[in-house]
Amino acid sequence: MDEQEIREEVALAERRATLYWWFASMLCRELDSDQLNTLCSESGRVLLDALAEEPSLAPGCQKLRRALAGVQVLATPQLELAADYATAFLGDHLGSAPPYASVYVEPGGMMFQHPHQQMVQWLQQWQLAVSFDGNEPADHFAIMLDLMGNLVLKGVDSPEAQSAQSALLAEMLPPMRRWVTQCQRQPGFYAALAELLLAFVSLDQTLIEGEFSLAQ
């Protein structure tokens, strides 16, 4: 691999990691005023336009744009979104869609199942601390996305981190698909965000599996 190819690989990894961290920041807690203003600004539009250039992400981007347009006409958009966040994610699995992988791996929606234990192990292995408010289970999708962003950057020069990306996606995607389906029971911003997230993660899995198979 020549110097130009290395620079391109690093730049791609930085873009992927940034997107994983962006989605994590959207999910980890209610949006603050700065996040909402940025999302509704020119930079937010540019981000969604760039994502929409990928055909598999275009429908999700369009839904998120429509949801944002609806939010912007509200009298108190940040407060309304905070209420939507609570309704969407903070109830039990019967009435909302808690963003924890464990809830979707076994009937009954139990917390602290295998995905949580696996994430604790991975976070320790990669010496990463959870920077969340409160005492979140380690399999919160935002924590899993944050870890993925770190593995993407480490994977530029670490075959072990490349393999870890595939393992994390295999752990995360099946429960995420069920979670996204459950999110659609509460239409609006977070349902649209979840749908776009799933499209992005699914696309990334396809891309890295193709890259790793070619490298073998």
UniProtKB/Swiss-Prot annotation:
Query: Which cellular component, as a GO term, is one annotated location?
Result: cytoplasm
InterPro entries tied to this protein = Chaperone_TorD, DMSO/NO3_reduct_chaperone, HscB_C_sf, TorD-like_sf, TorD/DmsD_chaperones
UniProt record, GO biological process: protein complex oligomerization; protein folding
- Localization (cell): Cytoplasm
Main localisation, per the record? cytoplasm
Keywords, comma-separated and alphabetical: Chaperone, Cytoplasm
Instruction: Write down the Gene3D superfamilies for this protein, in alphabetical order.
Output: 1.20.120.1820, HscB, C-terminal domain
Q: List the disulfide bonds.
A: none
Cite the HAMAP family for this sequence: TorD
Q: What protein family does this chain belong to?
A: Belongs to the TorD/DmsD family. TorD subfamily.
Please explain the role this protein plays, according to its UniProt record.
Involved in the biogenesis of TorA. Acts on TorA before the insertion of the molybdenum cofactor and, as a result, probably favors a conformation of the apoenzyme that is competent for acquiring the cofactor.
The protein depicted here goes by the name Chaperone protein TorD
